[in-house]
Structures are given as C-alpha cells and as structure tokens.
Curated annotation (Swiss-Prot):
Residues 680-909 form the FAD-binding FR-type domain. Residues 501-644 form the Flavodoxin-like domain. It is an enzyme of class 1 (oxidoreductase). Its EC number is 1.14.14.1, 1.6.2.4. This is Self-sufficient cytochrome P450 monooxygenase CYP505AG1. It comes from Oidiodendron maius (strain Zn).
Length: 1073
C-alpha cells in the first residue's frame, strides 16, 4: 500500500439499510431539498444508496473542478437521468458516453446552434414573446398571473416554432397547459421519484408505471405528428427539424433514423423549454424581491433599448441583464446537478477513493454557493458579482449551470438569447408587482426546479396600450428622457442643448439619496437631462464614460468606510488603470459630520481622487456639507449655483436666470372622495408587543417587538430601517394651513424631488403623513420662493432677512421648517403644489435591533427613546418623526421594515470562547448589546465557555430608566455578563452605583478594563456623540501611560493602527429622530 493510500478516508454518509438503501433518509416528493439539507451535515462530499445505486455527492468547487477534467471523468447516465432513457433512449441528453447515435446527432445538429443561426431565430422568438405581452396587457393590472406557467407556455412555443416551425399556440388554451406539457411533467417527475426507490419496490407501483408509459407514448405521438407534418409540407427553413430529417453526419455520412429523430425532438422540446422557463421564473422572483436590482435592470433596458423594437444588437449591450441571469442561475440552477464518473479508479481531493464508473453527482446549488469562491455573502442575491469584469475573474468551473465540456448544453446560446429578449421585453412594457408581497420562495421539483405558487400582476408602462404591442400605432416619440427607471417626456423647460447627467449616491440613512433626487430635480433648470439616479454599486463596470455626459456623485463616510451600497464601487474604482475613464466629466459632493474628524469626508475625497487618477475630468471642486453646522440641502443648493452648473456650463449649457430657478410649481387637482391606501416596497411586519420602559423624569423609552417574515434574517448588532409616518400634530398643521380636509384627494404628478409618480391619486393626509419631511429646515431657495409669493409689506422684509444674513442663526440653527414659516407669515400665498415640491421625501430611519434572532425566532425588538421637546424656534414642539411613530404602535399594527446589516466590525466575535468584550452604552444605546447578551446566553446554555463580558450602562436613575433591569440581573446571575451601571441623575447609597456618567464608571473599573484589553478584548460603544467622545477620551487615558495596580494598557488609542482600531474598538453613534 502506498503512502498516498494510507491518507485515504472513507466518504461519509448515513447508515445504509439492507435492500432499502437510504430510502428513509429522503423525502421522495422533495428529493433535491432532502439531499441539499443532508449535505449541510457532511461538508464537501457524502454518499447515499438510492434505487440500488451508490451515489457520491460533491458540494465544493475544489472537488468539482477536479471532476470537470474530461480526461479523467465523463458523463454517466444513471438514476433519474437513466430512467429518462425509457422515453428518449440515446437522445443528446441521455446518451451514454461514446454512444454512436449521440455522435451522429451531435455533429448534425451543432451548426444549427451556431452564433449566426441563433441570431436568425430572434424574429421567431419575438413573435412568441409578443403573444405573452398581449395576453398580459389584455388581462389588465388586476389579473393574477401564474408567471412560471406563462413562461413555460412561452418557452415551449418558442423552441417549437423557432426550431421546428410548429405552433403549440399555448396562449390560446385559456388557463390549461398543452397536453405535451402535462405528459412531460409526469414523465420527469416519475423518472426522478422512481430513481430513489429500490427496483423491487418500483415493481409494485403499477399505476405509476402505467402513467409513466402513457406520458412517454403521448410525447412520442406528438413528436411523430410534428415530423409527419413537415414531411407532408416540405419547407426550406434552415432549422433543427430539417437538419434532423435531411442532415448527414460529416464524419460518417450517416443520416438519422426516425427513432433517433423522435428521441431528439422530445429531448429538445423538454430540455429546450423546461430549464429556460425555470430560469426566467427565478429571475423575476429575484427582481421583484430586490427592488434595487429591478430598478437597475429596467434602467438598463430603458437606456439601451428605450421604447423601440428590440434588436440583436441591443441584446449584446445589456451587461446588467446578463449579470441578473447569471446570478439567478448561480443561486438556483434549474438543472440542479450533473452526473459524472471516473474513467479509471481514482481519488478526489487526494483522499476520497472513487471507482471507475461510480456515479458522482455534482450539486450545483452548493458548488455555486461555495464561500471560498463567492465569499461570505455567497447565499445572497448580488448580481453585481456577475458583471463581466467580476465574472471573468472567477476560477474556472465556478459557474456551470449549462453542464460541462462536450456534454454541456448544446442550446445554451439559444436559451440565453431567448432569456435576454423575454426579460428586456417584459421590463420594457410592464411594471410587475408581486401578487402576494409576503411570498416566500417555494421550489417545485421534477428533474428540474422552478418557483411554485409564484403569482404576479402586470401593468403596462408609460400609458402603452395593447395596440402598441401589436405595432398598430406609431412608435413612441424619441424625445424622451429616463429618470429613475421610468420613461417620461423630455422637460419642455430645459434650455440650450440638453446635456445628459448621471447622478449616483452612496447612502445608508437615506440622506445622500434624498440629496441625489433633489439634484435631479434641479438639473433640467440648468439645461441638463437626467439619465439615471442610482446607487454607486449599481454602475460597477458600466459607469458612463462619454465625454459629453456629466457624472455627479453624492456620498459620505461611515466611520471612515463607504456606505453599504458603495463598498463594491469603491473597491472596483481602486482597480482601474490610468485613463480607464477616458476624460469622463465628473463632480463629487461630500457629506459628513465634523465630530468624526479623523474620517471627515474620507470616502468622498478618495472617490474624487481615484476618479481623477483613472482619467476622469473634474469639472467642479468637491462640494461639502457638514451636518454638524449646516443644512445639507442648503449646502447642495449653494454648490450647485456657485460651482457645479456654472463650471460645467462651459460644455455648452446656457445658465438660467435666478428668478426662473426658484421652486417649480406643479398643478394639483383637489377632489373629495376618500384616498386609497398607500403602499411601500419594504416588507410588511406585524407588531407583536409594546410596552413603556421608563418612568417620568427621563425621556420616554419604549420596547417594540416585531414579528418578521421567516426569510428576514439578522445578526446581533444589525439594524431595522422603518419608513415612518409624520406625527399627526404636524400633519394637521399642514392640512389647516392649506384649508384641506384629511380625505381631500390630491392628484400628484410628483412628490418633492422623488421623480415622476405618474399622476398618483393620494389623500392630503397621506401626502403630508407618509411622503414628505414636514420638519426639514427651510433652505435659502425655499425662502426665495416664499418671498416671491408674499405681498408687499406682509412680512417680506423679515423673510428677506431670513433668506440672507439671518439664515444660519434664525433658520438653520433653530431648525425652522417651511411649514413653520407659513404659519408665522400667514400672508404668504403659496399653493399646495409648490409646498409639496419644496419638501424632501420622507426618509427611512434606522434603529439597532435589541434582540438576538436565536432568542425568539422570526422576531426582532427595538428600544426607542422618544424625542418630544419644545422647538428651538419657540413655535410649539419638536417631535421626532420615527420615535413618536414607533412609540404609538400597538400589537397588531402592520409596519414596513427592512433589515440593514451593521458594519461587520460591530458584529460579535466569531469565537465567544476566545475574545472578551466590553460594551458601553447610555439610554436606548443599550439596544444592540441586549441582542449581544441574549446571543451569549444561548451559547453558554449550549456549552460554550464564554470569555468575560462587561456592560457599562449609563442611565438617569434606578427608578427612571434602568432598562431591562430584571432581564439583565438574570443574565448576570448566569455569568453571561457583568453589568456596571452609572446613574447620572441621582445620588445613591451604593458606591458602585454612585452618581456618575458611564465614562466615570469605566474609570472607576479601569483595572478590569485594562486586564480585558490586554487579553484581546473588543470594545463596542453605542450612544450619542457626546457620550461616545467622552468614552473614547477616558478609554485613551485608561490604556495609555496610567498605571493601575502595576498594570497598564499596551498602547494609547491614538497610537493604535487604523486596522487594529477598526477591529478592536468600534462605535455606533446615533441621533434621535
């Protein structure tokens, strides 16, 4: 025995029952799901005995890459695939390796699926695609569409019409599917199911066998009818059917027998439509459950194709659509596995023995999610990872949904073109929505997979009609511009030669996004047409590079790091060569807060420098907005007026008179029927519990528990974002100022600067409550507009002062809103449309989750500090929008939330037994640490030996806001955490709880802090900026030169490397909203 053989280890797997194999380990109705679930227990490889066959399952890229070597491994036809031979024998898909008829058919058919021939099929594909579009258009937006069913109809009709000249006319069969499809589904399902059952038991399944043979007979009869129809009606079509009938093998000179023709007709009718329809169904599932991806895909279609006829040239210019298809097939490959076998006895990975011909099933679902290839987020939907520049860098054999080598899918190019066309056509013509917003992905298994019970609704876009889909009316005017993925008429108010501008943002909290939309709103007044407003990550690899298209980027830093939707863009930007952007004009607007001095504007500055290094042309100096001392919207307006548009006007744009650039009014039609309900795209969740946490004497604090859908996952430290509703008090103020009843209906063309809404009809209450920021400080431009509609002598002088020298002290610093000014100066004659246009859209607010997902599955809790205080301006009260909204919730309320991962540094250490932790919080800043502690408690109860954890917690008083006291006492008794409280609002008898701030308590316990720090502790801080600064200052003293009991910290924070700091000391700073 060789040394190598000594290293061999057995392939793991469950125990095998005599005669039955692993039948009881598999759910025969959901075989694939069973195998995938089992695979999670065994790692990279395992084995089962099913249907009398020993099967080896591979789950990692490394092992799969090895078996893709065709000199060592070849296709093996066994199990479910082997059962298909009863219907199609040696067709292309089911032939054994080296089988003669496979070689003859393959050589005859190959030319039909060459690139030129595939392009020639586009007309036929569009013919069938039009039938789908007409069906959806005529049924209307309220019809519930079984999208997987309709895509099955489409792909069956497409393969039959384009390759055989035969029309199944599936869209004219009402709700029923063609008998061929029924037979095919039964055929595939039984082939799969019977493969898991021992042969001697299958012998007793007479009824199933009869149905199986009946399905085969039906499909062969249908195929023979198509064959005879062509023979009786000869055609000179250069298609698959004529190749099968008349082709000759260039190697042997042989033609194909009728038996072989029928085998391959069925093969193409089945394999040529079933996997494609599944792939398309998964594409639309992922697009509809990921609005940003849907927006990016639609924008690409609008930009490349517009509203015109789709051509083959268009399809070659859709990189994002290609990435979407690749990512859908990565996550859910519709042909979920291929089976290979060794040509000789060999080993895998140098340690697993496999015998010659032994079936090795390569499970694409897990291979395509290998974290060593795709990273820790391999299970997540991220089409950007499959853009060309990233896709081309993947290791070989990392993405194989079409199979391997010579036995790979011969019709891949056909399926790809068809998929591109269908996606582009549907996005071009329809707005799709989920029929059930809470739909959870279900998988229907035969030998292939597709989504089950997946229903959508389809509404024609941009006023298109079914007649236009038939080509009966004139083409839509080419005088269009694209905004936010919607096609809208070009702005008649633009002056000069309209120059395109792309506006990109990186934003976690929504502020930079709101600024981007405000800029988009302003651009037409300066002679620019906005082509898109999108996230930075959405343009990786497709950043506009034309010298006549301006790119404006608005972004910020989060503790020195990019926003979540800008991380991949920044990494990509660093890889660009000099002159890669070829003179692309650009400008950057930076947002920040000066309290983070070390990282102030760090990311915007980096982007500005990297763009210039890559050959882009800076047309204006970088704009800056410091939220600590100014209003960002005002800063943006100043930068626009003084730098951006004036600098870039040299390109040929005419500037616009200042008077013409004041706020644009819109017409609002007011009627009085009740409004329909307002819907948001976030996931609807149900409030399950609320209770007050604090007593009088401190800010009110509430505990809010939310029941989440099963597919909403989070980790301790992550965030929930909520789109709130404005306080009712403020809504009533706005209604009263414009003399509107709450149920008055506003027919609105747009809300603020969010872009075109298509004349939405909303109640006045909904508009003011759910769409706009009523408390946003007024900008100078807002005041200029108010001044222009104020009669002489009716406060004009005061308004002029407020818009001038007094702006910063009396408006910005006092946070005076437009609504405040309208109430203060009642003579202002502003229409409701102009008021709505002035206001930013209501933005999401983000809160730390105060629970562990493991503590109470499918639930998350929030810990809210309610902001309600006298307004700085002296006009009434200032109410935090989100905190008051959340505090008013009661069990049973439905609220729309999204999960936002925290920065990775704020997660708990992977190994709780290796790293101590120190948590520092004040007030509701305890939220993430409650989740940390719950998670640690569960680990301890599961036998994990925890390193020490200390929570320094600042409160006002023991009887006021000592949050979660009983719960924390129980955790402390278990040894999960040691809680050190600091009461800043009372004197107590206890020395350990004497009057102090949280940083004072840290100083008192500095010996333990130093001890844990020197043991590698990670420090987490959560609270307001003043508290965070105080904690950092005292911590710097603790770990600096000061000695305690002869011990001192390793080094001062100021001397620690940035890498060490980001890994070991991390803070989350919040503001009340």
């Amino acid at each position: 025995m060789t040394k190598k053989n000594h290293a061999l280890i057995p392939i793991p797997g469950p125990s095998v029952w005599p005669l039955l194999g692993n039948l009881f380990d598999i759910d025969t109705e959901h075989g694939l799901a069973s195998v995938l679930e089992m695979g999670r227990s065994y790692g990279d490889i395992f084995q089962l005995v099913l249907g009398g066959n020993k099967l080896v399952f591979l789950q990692t890229h490394a092992l799969f890459d090895e078996v893709c070597d065709e000199s060592r491994f070849c296709k093996v036809v066994v199990s479910g695939l082997g059962n298909l031979r009863a219907g199609v024998n040696d067709g292309l898909f089911t032939a054994h390796d080296g089988e003669h008829n496979w070689g003859v058919a393959h050589r005859i058919i190959m030319p039909i699926f060459g690139p030129i021939k595939i392009r020639e099929t586009l007309g036929g594909m569009k013919d069938v695609c039009q039938e789908l579009s007409l069906k959806w258009a005529r049924y209307g937006p309220d019809h519930r569409i079984d999208i997987a069913g309709d895509l099955t109809r489409l792909t069956l009709d497409t393969i039959a019409f384009c390759t055989m000249g035969y029309r199944f006319n599936s869209f004219y069969r009402n709700s029923d599917v063609h008998p061929f499809v029924k037979s095919m589904v039964g055929f595939l399902r039984e082939a799969d199911k019977s493969s898991m059952i021992p042969e001697y038991l299958n012998a007793f399944r007479w009824k199933a066998r009869r149905s199986f043979l009946g399905d085969i007979a039906s499909m062969r009869e249908m195929s023979m009818m198509i064959l005879n129809l062509r023979r009786g009606n000869p055609s000179d079509r250069d298609d698959l059917l004529n190749a099968l009938l008349h082709g000759r093998d260039p190697k042997t000179g042989e033609g194909m027998s009728d038996e072989s023709i029928i085998n391959n007709l069925i093969t193409f009718l089945v394999a040529g439509h079933e996997t494609t329809s599944g792939a398309l169904s998964f594409v639309f599932y992922y697009l509809l459950t990921n609005p940003e991806s849907l927006k990016n895909a639609r924008e690409e279609v609008d930009r490349v194709i517009g509203a015109g006829n789709i051509t083959a040239d268009h399809l070659s210019k859709l990189p994002y659509i290609d990435a979407v298809l690749r990512e859908a097939l990565r996550l859910n490959p519709t042909g979920p596995a291929i089976t290979l076998g060794a040509r000789e006895d060999t080993t895998l990975g140098g340690k697993y023995a496999v015998k010659k011909g032994e079936p090795v099933l390569c499970m694409f679902h897990n291979i395509h999610r290998d974290k060593k290839v795709y990273g820790e987020d391999a299970d997540e939907w991220k089409p950007e990872r499959m853009m060309d520049e990233n896709f081309n860098k993947l290791p070989k054999n990392a993405w194989k949904p079409f199979g391997n080598g010579t036995r790979g899918c011969i019709g891949r190019a056909f399926a790809w073109q068809e998929s591109q066309l269908v996606i582009a056509s549907i996005l071009q013509n329809f707005d799709l929505t989920l029929d059930n917003p809470d739909y959870k992905l279900e998988i229907v298994e035969t030998l292939t997979i597709k989504p089950g019970n997946f229903y959508v609704r389809a509404k024609l876009r941009s006023g298109r009609t079914p007649r236009e889909l038939c080509g009966f009316s004139n083409p839509i005017s080419t005088n269009i511009q694209i905004k936010n993925g919607t096609i809208a008429p070009a702005n008649d108010g633009q002056v000069g030669n309209s120059t395109p501008v792309t506006i990109l943002y990186g934003s976690n909290s929504g502020t930079c996004e709101a600024l981007a939309h405000r800029l988009a709103r302003d651009a037409p007044s300066y002679g620019y047409s906005v082509t898109t407003v999108a996230t930075l990550d959405s343009v990786i690899g497709i950043l506009p590079r034309a010298k006549d298209e301006l790119v404006v980027i608005i972004t910020c830093s989060y503790d020195g790091l990019p926003a979540d939707n800008a991380v991949r863009f920044c990494n990509w930007l660093k890889t660009l060569d000099e002159d890669a952007l070829g003179g692309m004009p650009f400008a950057v607007f930076a947002c920040g807060h000066h309290d983070w001095a070390k990282t102030f504007y760090k990311v915007p500055i980096m982007i500005d420098e990297l763009l210039a290094r890559a050959g882009a042309h800076r047309v204006a100096q970088m704009g800056k907005a410091n939220s600590a001392v100014s209003d960002m919207f005002s800063d943006l307006e100043n930068w626009e007026d003084e730098h951006l548009w004036s600098s870039s006007s040299a390109a040929g744009n005419e500037t616009v008179d200042n008077v013409a650039r004041t706020e644009v009014k819109q017409d609002i039609t007011i009627t009085n029927p009740r409004a329909r309900a307002l819907h948001h795209n976030a996931v609807e969740c149900i409030v399950s519990e609320t209770h007050k946490l604090s007593e009088s004497g401190s800010a009110l604090k509430y505990h809010v528990e939310i029941q989440l859908p099963a597919n909403m996952k989070y980790a301790p430290g992550d965030h929930l974002s909520v789109l709130p509703i404005n306080p009712r008090q403020n809504v009533r103020r706005a209604l009263a100022r414009f003399h509107l009843a709450g149920d008055s209906v506003l027919s609105v063309a747009r809300i603020g600067h969010m872009g075109t809404l298509g004349q939405e009809t909303l109640s006045a209450f909904d508009v003011f409550a759910s769409y706009v920021e009523l408390s946003q400080p007024a900008t100078r431009r807002n005041i200029a507009t108010l001044l222009s509609v104020t009669p002489e002598g009716e406060g004009r002088y005061e308004l002029a002062e407020l818009g001038g020298a007094a702006f910063e002290s009396q408006i910005r610093d006092m946070r005076v809103s437009v609504l405040d000014l309208l109430e203060r100066y009642k003579a202002i004659k502003l229409c409701v449309g102009a008021f709505i246009d002035m206001l930013p859209p209501l933005r999401v607010r983000t809160y730390s989750i105060s629970s562990s997902a493991l503590w109470k599955p499918s639930h998350a809790s929030l810990t809210i500090s309610v902001l309600a205080q006298p307004a700085l301006s002296g006009q009434g009260s200032f109410l935090g929008v989100a905190s008051n909204f959340l505090a008013d919730l009661v069990p049973g309320d439905a609220v729309h939330f999204t999960i936002r991962p925290c920065k990775k540094q704020f997660h708990l250490p992977d190994d709780a037994s290796a790293h101590p932790i120190i948590m520092v919080a004040a007030g509701s800043g305890i939220a993430p640490f409650r989740g940390f502690i719950q998670d640690r408690a569960l680990q301890r109860r599961n036998g994990v030996q925890l390193q020490p954890a200390i929570l320094f917690f600042g409160c006002r008083g023991s009887k006021q806001d000592d949050l979660y006291r009983q719960e924390l006492d129980e955790f402390e008794a278990e040894g999960v955490v040691s809680v050190r409280r600091a009461f800043s609002g009372e004197e107590t008898v206890s020395i350990s709880e004497s009057r102090m701030y949280v940083q004072d308590r840290m100083w008192a316990d500095r010996a333990e802090v130093i001890q844990l720090w020197n043991l590698g502790a990670k420090i987490y801080v959560c609270g307001g900026i003043n508290m965070a600064d105080g904690v950092r200052e005292i911590f710097n003293e603790i770990v600096g030169p000061t000695e305690v009991d002869g011990k001192r910290g390793a080094e001062s924070l100021n001397k620690l490397s940035e890498e060490t700091m980001s890994a070991r000391y991390v803070a989350e700073i919040f503001s009340q909203t």
